[in-house]
């Protein structure tokens, strides 16, 4: 497992903007307004409703569908619905979101981990960026072990840091320094989050490999290798990544 401090330095270096390349014809390009993972430009919170779970192997589990952009206040809305259930009720949350608020995505993931809530990505629009971070917090109430389930036809996507520049603004050395500090704050938050949910840094390379303006979809093989359960839509069987890992390690 990679050391968090090493990854932090690497991520800050990768995400650091090349300001020299932004100077052209005596005109300074304005610098970033935000430093974050891909955000969905949409107002309003996600819609949270009760849903049936189409995946076998989850008996006596109450399902919730989380659909829409990740926005501030979503965690509280979800907790409002879950609080109506007996505390010993097993819960799974099906995530369908193109992304959104990074901080809220991390907060959701931490809650899933603390409350031992299973996370699911079904076929459909999938779960990307801030949503995929929340997905990683899924855990089984029965075993206490990670329990993140992705449909073999369900898109799960990660996104690299994006730095947005305003061509109508001039930037100063302080602006540049603030931007670099912002990058480091985001990477620190990600590393702290992975540590909180007891996850190694396996998923960080998927973020780094993604083009800045694109989502990198995780193939099923990489999903299993990363410790995520995959529900095979063809065989209707749930693949336990720990068993595959043991078999591969034994050989």
At which residue positions do the language-model features occur?
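N-terminal secretory signal peptides that target proteins for export/translocation
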Residues: 1-22
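Small-residue-centered hinge/linker elements
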Residues: 43-87, 97-100, 144-199
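Short, glycine-/small-residue-enriched flexible loop/hinge segments at domain edges that mediate gating
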Residues: 89-104, 118-126
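Glycine-rich beta-to-alpha active-site loop
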Residues: 113, 117-163
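Membrane-embedded segments
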Residues: 102-109, 113
């Amino acid at each position: 497992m990679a050391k968090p401090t090493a990854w932090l330095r690497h991520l800050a270096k990768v995400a650091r903007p090349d300001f020299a390349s932004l100077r052209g014809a005596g005109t300074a390009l304005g610098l970033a307004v935000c430093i974050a993972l891909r955000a969905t430009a949409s107002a309003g919170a996600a819609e949270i409703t009760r849903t049936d779970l189409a995946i076998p192997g989850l008996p006596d589990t109450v399902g919730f569908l989380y659909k829409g952009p990740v926005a501030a206040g979503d965690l509280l809305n979800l907790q409002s619905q879950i609080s109506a259930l007996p505390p010993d009720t097993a819960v799974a949350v099906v995530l369908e979101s193109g992304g959104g608020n990074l901080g809220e995505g991390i907060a959701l993931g931490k809650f899933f981990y603390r409350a031992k809530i299973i996370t699911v990505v079904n076929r459909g629009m999938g779960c990307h960026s801030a949503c995929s971070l929340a997905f990683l917090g899924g855990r089984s109430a029965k075993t206490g072990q990670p329990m993140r389930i992705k449909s073999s036809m369900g898109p799960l996507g990660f996104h690299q840091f994006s730095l947005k520049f305003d061509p109508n603004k001039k930037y100063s050395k302080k602006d540049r320094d603030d931007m670099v500090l912002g990058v480091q704050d985001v990477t620190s938050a990600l590393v702290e989050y992975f540590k909180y949910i007891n996850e190694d840094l396996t998923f960080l390379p998927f973020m780094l490999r993604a083009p800045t303006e694109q989502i990198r979809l995780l193939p099923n093989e990489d999903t299993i290798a990363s410790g995520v359960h995959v529900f095979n839509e063809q065989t209707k069987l749930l693949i336990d990544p720990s068993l595959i890992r043991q078999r591969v390690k034994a050989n």
